[in-house]
Amino acid sequence: MKALIIDPAVHSLGGHHFNAVQRLRDELAGLGVAAPCLGSAYADRRVVDELACTPTFTRSVYGRLYATPGEFTDSVEETGRQLAEAMRRSGTPDLIILPCCDQVSAMALARQLRRSWSRPRPRILLWLLYGPHHLKTPDDPAAANLDGEARAAFAELAGSAGSIEAYCETPEMADFYRNLVPFGVGVMAGPGLPARARAARAAGRPPVVSCIGFANRAKGYRLMPQALQHVLGRHGDVRFMIHGIVKGSDAEADQPLFDRLAELGERVEVRQEVLASDEYLARLAEADLLLLPYAPDVYRRRGSGVFADAHHVGIPVVAPKECAFARPAFEGGWGVAMKAYDGKSLGIAVLEALDRLEPLGACAAEAAGRAQDGLGRVLSASVEGKTGRSSGLASLLRRFRPRTTPGSA
């Protein structure tokens, strides 16, 4: 069978888009299925080589401004042209996976599949990571006018695909989409790197508090200077490792913030390089406490790939009380909630977590032991279902094929 991964946002090494495609390809390879990728037109050479990625899309899923009513139509047309050209060369696959699907990708793919009416309709596996506006929670009245375009796009995709299996990362986001799309929506974290066992913290070693990932504005890095100063003045041993990539993010002008953090002294390590998968996992495993001060006005319903990784590794977290992704940690005893969204509240939450680090860590380790990674099962079912369907169709066609009799030409 043929599989294809589509993610217009994958363009460089590191980050959860790269990790998602890499994990999907590895899992599918284990099932004997090759899965090339269509990614950003600006994908660098390592992405092209390591992910079998064809640079395709000039618009990222994060590239919309939502400024005019015609922007959606323009985005669909441009994405559709680029998708049609790429699939003209590669052919229509049996299985299409979109690890980060929005309404533009959905509508463009639906129209492309309608053009390929003579071919068997593919099975589609997709994740809906955010609402119709990627920078606003679906509850925001300013995003409500986008519900119509999303409803139309996913309805058209449902009518063009053989079947659709869809997931959100939180129950709250899944509830929103169940009222918007004509297919079922489950709850499962997006494809991430396989969990790696973490060594227990050595007795007497100072605790390490970390923040890691792309430094987009909604990730809350602007709260760090005040928070770290608050903690450093009240805790004599703690060490901070603050990793944030500003290049390619929407916060490239925030470099002075990281310069300020680097001036806070020897107990603060600041890193900004792109991390390969192994480096990311190694850095994550060093953390005794993970900071996820994500803006609630963006992440109220959304999931977090870093949180999912922390869950599987067994790391306590600090996050805003409103963020749905962190609710399992709050309820499971391995998360501390920020009472307000500002730097001082982040610092207070960190101090609370440091005072309770041993029981928080024990609960995090217990939660990690119970965590289930369902990606392999889902992909296996998708491959087996599609292969069985293709075999059944081939058998049916053979029944109607003219037979060659002895003596016939």
What are these regions (language model features)?
Residues 292-308, 320-322, 326-327:
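Nucleotide-sugar-dependent
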Residues 71-74, 83-106, 125:
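Short N-terminal targeting/anchoring amphipathic segment
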